[in-house]
């Protein structure tokens, strides 16, 4: 049972009509990231599937774990914020190991949690801002 106050429907009545346009814009930004960063062997981007396009609430790349912190520090020095939205794999969360008493080893998930970096992505991100971000990513890996 969920009860909504009157403010939530008012907010949704404004936001929902914009959902498709905002999602389309994020998809366009993600496609542009893919194009601009496609020649970099030093990063991995997630696969894109034609029959199931992402909504790109995040745009996550993977870099080697040994350079991730330095890479993020470099981008921050250029005014580019990044995130690590999934820093711990499910198999290593305390709820999994301590409370559920599940002992499982998921090497790929654990590796991914050490390599992921989320780049800025939001519908208002301009081409100029995205060019700036990508130029600095490329510069970092060409040094």
Locate the predicted segments by residue.
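PLP-dependent aminotransferase class I/II
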Residues: 1-143
């Amino acid at each position: 049972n969920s009860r909504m106050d009157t403010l939530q429907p008012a907010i949704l009545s404004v936001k929902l009509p914009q959902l498709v346009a905002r999602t389309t814009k994020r998809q366009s930004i993600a496609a542009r990231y893919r194009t601009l960063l496609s020649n970099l062997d030093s990063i991995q981007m997630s696969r894109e599937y034609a029959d199931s396009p992402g909504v790109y609430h995040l745009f996550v790349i993977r870099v080697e774990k040994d350079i991730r912190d330095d890479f993020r520090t470099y981008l921050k020095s250029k005014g580019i914020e990044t995130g690590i939205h999934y820093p711990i794999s499910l198999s290593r969360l305390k709820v999994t190991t301590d409370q559920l008493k599940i002992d499982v080893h998921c090497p790929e998930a654990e590796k991914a949690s050490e390599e992921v970096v989320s780049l800025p992505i939001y519908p208002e991100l301009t081409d100029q801002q995205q060019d700036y971000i990508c130029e600095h990513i490329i510069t970092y890996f060409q040094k």
